[in-house]
Amino acid sequence: MLGEQAYLDLCKQIFKTGEQRGDRTNTGTHSIFGHQIRFDLNKGFPLLTTKRVPFRLVASELLWFIKGDTNIRYLLKHNNNIWNEWAFEKWVNSADYQGPDMANFGLRSQKDENFNKQYQEQMELFKTRILEDDSFADKYGDLGSVYGKQWRNWKTTQNETIDQLKDVIHSIKTNPNSRRHIVSAWNPEDIPTMALPPCHTLFQFYVSNGKLSCQLYQRSADVFLGVPFNIASYALLTHLIAHECGLEVGDFVHTFGDAHIYSNHVEQVETQLEREIRDFPQLIINKDKNSIFEMDLDDLVIENYNPHPSIKAPIAV
């Protein structure tokens, strides 16, 4: 099964055969191991239609990765809050933090309305300081050796760096039949310094008949909240690299390790499964820019996107 139906079938499969498991966040999940879905990128841009997926958040996060940035300040400047909780956790667990107790803020904010008000107030103060205070942003806005660092500045044992993204684009242009068009974000040495070890760990490109395809291996997949973003993000990355390399797009193949639905997302997924699939939108890339490294948010436009309404759900931190 291709396209959005494959995603919905994954949700159904997790409900049908998934194992109930504990997890790092103490939320609990329904989980399966080993699954694959596929999208033909010539049949529209895979921004799910059974709920609204905010394209500008997807695009600004990807551009953040592409820039090699690891500080949430760039994201906040683009009204993107999807990484805030991990930076905030570092702040409230530090000796410098003197505010109210924020232990287990992810779960407590869902269960305690009074605490949630405190949490929201502290988060807004944190965001403001990140945007306005350079030294504070340098210390508490940085997430460590996460995706952007590994993609663009992988450290070697020789104290040199490897720009994996630049190298893979060069490889696609000069040796399209290579089986080594690979970028890895999983660096065992750096795992302890990351705010969150990479969930989408490795991707590989494949050129055939003038078309560029991409396969992603994702070790851990939050199927309701994260996976719709991941699908759109790697589809966008494939489009951008194809654009630079003078290729058409082929398939995006999404391979999962632990694919799970959090216990507090079950009702939301059930709502989504009741909705009818609509046509995918189209992606328009500014033709006046060629290099992926020159792209800005305004160079990427989605047209004819007509999704069902968004479905809110808590994030597990």
Curated annotation (Swiss-Prot):
Broad EC category: transferase
Pfam families named among the record's database cross-references: Thymidylat_synt (PF00303)
GO MF annotation terms: thymidylate synthase activity
Keywords, alphabetical: Cytoplasm, Methyltransferase, Nucleotide biosynthesis, Transferase
GO terms for biological process, alphabetical: dTMP biosynthetic process; dTTP biosynthetic process; methylation
Protein origin, superkingdom: Bacteria
Catalysed conversion reaction: dUMP + (6R)-5,10-methylene-5,6,7,8-tetrahydrofolate = 7,8-dihydrofolate + dTMP
Annotated positions binding (6R)-5,10-methylene-5,6,7,8-tetrahydrofolate: D222, A316
Pathway where it operates: Pyrimidine metabolism; dTTP biosynthesis
Subcellular location(s) of the protein: Cytoplasm
Primary subcellular site in the record, as a coarse category: cytoplasm
Active-site residues annotated for this sequence: C199 (nucleophile)
Entry GO CC: cytosol
Binding residues annotated for dUMP, in chain numbering: R24, R179, R180, R219, S220, A221, D222, N230, H260, I261, Y262
EC number: 2.1.1.45
PANTHER family given in the database record: THYMIDYLATE SYNTHASE, THYMIDYLATE SYNTHASE 1
Biological role: Catalyzes the reductive methylation of 2'-deoxyuridine-5'-monophosphate (dUMP) to 2'-deoxythymidine-5'-monophosphate (dTMP) while utilizing 5,10-methylenetetrahydrofolate (mTHF) as the methyl donor and reductant in the reaction, yielding dihydrofolate (DHF) as a by-product. This enzymatic reaction provides an intracellular de novo source of dTMP, an essential precursor for DNA biosynthesis.
Family in the record: Belongs to the thymidylate synthase family. Bacterial-type ThyA subfamily.
Subunit structure: Homodimer.
Listed name of the protein: Thymidylate synthase
